[in-house]
């Protein structure tokens, strides 16, 4: 079995190496000049809870980060690269150990042919450590986290927060952030109601001698690209076997993918009503397309299936491996697959909410640039509050009715500027307390709109005030919850 362990580790590293409070103080630029962005690659990592009979997936989680030196009006931001002397550490506050929360280490030597130290994962990473660096990002593969915190060993907490800390070569703490490190054991074939026991699954393979000597590692025979396991070459991949066998029995993805309690599909696609099958097709379709030549985990649905080229992956790459603005990973600003911000889960939104004051993709230019640059940014996006509507020059300055109104999530606030000059757009409550400033910049004459998110607003009536060239204009807006 030792050769299987070596295959797993080598293949996992080869596959991923070049791929790209307790709420503790979340995102903090301690020196005032650095930002660290963290993310997980998949939106959910699954693992068996018990390994006495078989192993579908071991404890294995990933974290990534960028460290950015904030720019100013005269200097562009700098994404710190490998060899710069900077480094990033990771930890999971409230979850400091895994031994005892799972029996993985009891059976690891039988499954992988070698002894693995307690609380250390397949790649040698522990529950805390220093991330490795590659090009312009930092990474940690194989963190052996379980969904159980130190104070609750029986109830899953699938959306815990990792703490990332960025340091310079002199060991000065520069910035911190917290981002989701998702994990679930809710892939159990028994708890799903499909099988009476794990032994029942092994009995389906009773013609194979190895199944009389558990635990059995499924990927030993069934290829699993997620683990870098090639299989034995004589049977179908694990994904094909599972989806084709069960496709005629259910079209409920949460029978296996976590799960009715975890609800791992939680991102913006979920919010706007998309389901698993909208992108992946039916359970049977997932298996049948593999039989037709698709490689699971490698050939997956593309953003470009619905979005234009300006909002799509890099050619030939998955979303999780694609990069955009200044070489940043797409997930650094938009978050993980299946958990795109704005997410239904508060922890997914925490990093961007802390950085820019509202949930959603990271698009407040000042976070990295230190000021609002002129002209459009990534995806042709203009800074919040400075979104041109048309090239028309208005005959008067005015704040127009917002839409939708009332609103619960986000509203657009159109406004017109007659003459070039300083512009402020503020939001007040009915007591006259300023809630937020949407724009404070010098604008040319034109028609614009601002976006206001309701995540920090209680239900009620608010006043938007547009100030330009010594005059004020007001408009009521209504928030519902």
Language-model segments: which ranges?
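Surface-exposed, short loops/turns at beta-strand junctions within beta-sandwich domains
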Residues: 153-158, 455-458
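Short, surface-exposed loop/turn motifs with a glycine/proline- and acidic-biased composition
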Residues: 420, 438-474, 478
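Short, aromatic- and glycine-rich surface loops/edge beta-strands on solvent-exposed regions
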Residues: 65, 157-169, 462-466
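Inter-heme linker and motif-flanking segments adjacent to c-type heme-binding CXXCH motifs
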Residues: 170-177, 196-211, 224-384
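Sec-dependent, cleavable N-terminal signal peptides
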Residues: 1-28
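Short S/T/G/P-enriched beta-strand
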Residues: 24-62, 68-87, 91-95, 172-212, ...
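Extended, solvent-exposed segments with strong compositional bias
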Residues: 105-147
């Amino acid at each position: 079995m030792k050769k299987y362990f070596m295959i797993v580790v080598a293949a996992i590293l080869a596959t991923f190496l070049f791929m790209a409070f307790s709420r503790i103080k979340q995102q903090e630029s301690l020196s005032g000049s650095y930002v660290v962005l963290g993310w997980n690659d998949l939106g959910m990592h699954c693992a068996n809870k018990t390994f006495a009979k078989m192993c579908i997936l071991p404890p294995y989680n990933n974290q990534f980060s960028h460290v950015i030196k904030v720019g100013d009006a005269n200097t562009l931001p700098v994404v710190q690269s490998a060899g710069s002397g900077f480094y990033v550490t990771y930890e999971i506050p409230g979850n400091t150990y895994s031994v005892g929360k799972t029996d993985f280490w009891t059976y690891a030597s039988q499954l992988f042919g070698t002894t693995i130290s307690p609380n250390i994962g397949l790649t040698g990473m522990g529950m805390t450590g220093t991330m490795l660096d590659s090009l312009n990002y930092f990474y940690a593969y194989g963190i052996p986290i379980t969904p159980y915190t130190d104070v609750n060993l029986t109830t899953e907490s699938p959306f815990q927060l990792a703490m990332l800390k960025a340091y310079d070569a002199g060991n000065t703490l520069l910035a911190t952030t917290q981002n989701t490190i998702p994990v679930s054991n809710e892939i159990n074939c028994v708890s799903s109601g499909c099988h009476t026991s794990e032994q029942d699954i092994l009995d389906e393979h009773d013609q194979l001698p190895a199944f009389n000597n558990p635990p059995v590692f499924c990927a030993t025979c069934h290829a699993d690209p997620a683990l870098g396991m090639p299989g034995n070459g004589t049977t179908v991949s694990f994904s094909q076997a599972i989806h084709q066998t069960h496709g005629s029995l259910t079209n409920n993805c949460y029978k296996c993918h976590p799960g009715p309690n975890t609800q791992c599909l939680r991102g913006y696609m979920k919010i706007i009503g998309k389901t698993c099958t909208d992108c992946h097709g039916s359970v049977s379709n997932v298996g049948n397309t593999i039989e037709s030549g698709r490689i699971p985990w490698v050939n997956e649905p593309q953003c470009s299936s619905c979005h234009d080229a300006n909002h799509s992956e890099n050619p030939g790459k998955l979303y999780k491996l694609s990069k955009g603005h200044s070489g940043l990973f797409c997930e650094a600003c938009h978050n993980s697959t299946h958990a795109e911000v704005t997410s239904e889960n508060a922890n997914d939104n925490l990093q961007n909410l802390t950085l820019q004051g509202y949930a959603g993709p990271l698009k407040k230019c000042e976070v990295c640039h230190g000021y609002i640059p002129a002209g459009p940014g990534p995806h042709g996006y203009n800074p919040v509050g400075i979104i041109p509507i048309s090239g028309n020059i208005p005959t008067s300055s005015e704040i127009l009715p917002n839409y939708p109104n009332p609103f619960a999530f986000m509203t657009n606030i159109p406004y017109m500027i007659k003459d070039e000059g300083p512009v402020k757009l503020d939001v007040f409550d009915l007591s006259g307390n300023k809630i937020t400033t949407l724009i404070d910049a010098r604008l040319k004459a034109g028609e614009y709109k601002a976006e206001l998110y309701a995540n920090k607003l209680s239900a009620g009536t608010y006043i938007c005030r547009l100030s330009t060239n010594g005059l004020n204009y007001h408009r009521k807006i209504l928030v519902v919850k």
